[in-house]
């Protein structure tokens, strides 16, 4: 079965297929949206030439979602909890954004979906992600078990030269934790349990609140960048690439140990998702860069930001 092959092979297949989907179907979808006059009503931000983009086809996020979901359904391990979370997040926010675009375009309501309903949807996803990360037995980290060992250096006459104490790694164990990490910083682990005094209920509540904040903030942040040529996709591509590399390192026990970063079993599968995600964004950038032939609309921007947020939560970065 192709899903049992190496992650690198499946990631390469995912990024190629995502690019092909956008290239093959992108032009057809753009032409269809033009014929149906599904255009963008540009917000006037005072930028030169901005209002000339009024009428540019929107809802191009459908192309991105299609180019993400098809490769991951073909090449991803669907029994992996992280892949399940990413698929749910993509579809969930894609539907919310799609409903917003539908109201704007077909109901001719510039406001689109009420802001409170968007927030409710984002908060709901944050609760699902935070609760799953807390409760799922498949989501664990591997922590090193150390023991202090004291070494004493003696002179020939038996007098002490130096006494050195160091921690020796005895083994590693899988455990549930609310720790997160800051990449590229030494001693970078932070445990939310430290703030709540290790109280289980309070720690869970804090962890879910953090998940809600991250999902809502990043999703809305990405939403604000749409409407300018290539901005949302151009910013997102390097972010997804870095997250993909971090997922690969965090899911590889040898590299994680060598680089002294948190080892997260099964998180390496997220590399396949990141590859499909990056391929979809790069392909879409071809049509979205200046002069933009299509905008992703809320269908794409809400999903892109939310998926990036959930990805970062999954790899605890």
What name fits each language-model region?
Residues 11-17, 46-55:
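Glycine-/proline-rich flexible loop or hinge segments
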Residues 3-30, 64-95, 102, 116, ...:
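Alpha-helical transmembrane segments
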Residues 53-65, 117-123:
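Select subsegments of transmembrane alpha-helices in polytopic membrane proteins
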Residues 44-53, 85, 108, 192-200, ...:
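Short juxtamembrane and helix-loop transition motifs at transmembrane-helix boundaries
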Residues 29-52, 102-111, 173-185:
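Cytosolic, membrane-interface loops and tails of multi-pass inner-membrane proteins
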Residues 183-213, 219:
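Individual transmembrane alpha-helix segments
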Residues 43, 47, 56, 64, ...:
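Short capping/connector residues at structural and topological boundaries
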């Amino acid at each position: 079965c192709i899903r049992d092959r190496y992650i690198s092979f499946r990631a390469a297949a995912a990024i190629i297929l995502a690019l092909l989907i956008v290239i093959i179907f992108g032009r057809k979808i753009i032409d269809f949206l033009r014929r149906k006059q599904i255009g963008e009503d540009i917000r006037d931000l005072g930028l030169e030439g901005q209002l000339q983009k009024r009428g540019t086809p929107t809802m191009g996020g459908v192309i991105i979602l299609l180019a993400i979901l098809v490769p991951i359904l073909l090449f991803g391990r669907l029994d992996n909890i992280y892949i399940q979370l990413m698929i749910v997040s993509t579809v969930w926010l894609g539907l919310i954004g799609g409903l917003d675009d539908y109201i704007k375009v077909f109901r001719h309501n510039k406001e689109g979906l009420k802001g409170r309903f968007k927030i409710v949807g984002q908060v709901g996803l944050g609760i699902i992600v935070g609760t799953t990360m807390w409760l799922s037995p498949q989501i664990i980290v591997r922590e090193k078990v150390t023991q202090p060992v004291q070494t004493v250096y003696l002179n020939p006459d038996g007098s002490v030269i130096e006494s050195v104490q160091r921690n020796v790694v005895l083994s590693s164990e899988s455990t549930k934790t609310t720790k997160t990490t800051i990449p590229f910083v030494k001693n970078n682990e932070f445990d939310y349990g430290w703030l709540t005094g290790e109280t289980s209920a309070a720690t869970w509540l804090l962890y879910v609140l953090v998940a809600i904040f991250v999902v809502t903030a990043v999703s809305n942040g990405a939403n604000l960048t749409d409407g300018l040529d290539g901005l949302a996709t151009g910013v997102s591509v390097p972010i997804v690439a870095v997250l993909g590399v971090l997922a690969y390192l965090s899911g590889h026990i040898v590299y994680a140990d060598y680089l002294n970063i948190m080892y997260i079993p099964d998180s390496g599968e997220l590399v396949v998702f990141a590859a499909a995600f990056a391929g979809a964004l790069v392909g879409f950038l071809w049509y979205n860069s200046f002069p933009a032939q299509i905008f992703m609309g809320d269908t794409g921007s809400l999903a892109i930001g939310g998926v990036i947020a959930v990805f970062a939560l999954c790899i605890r970065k």
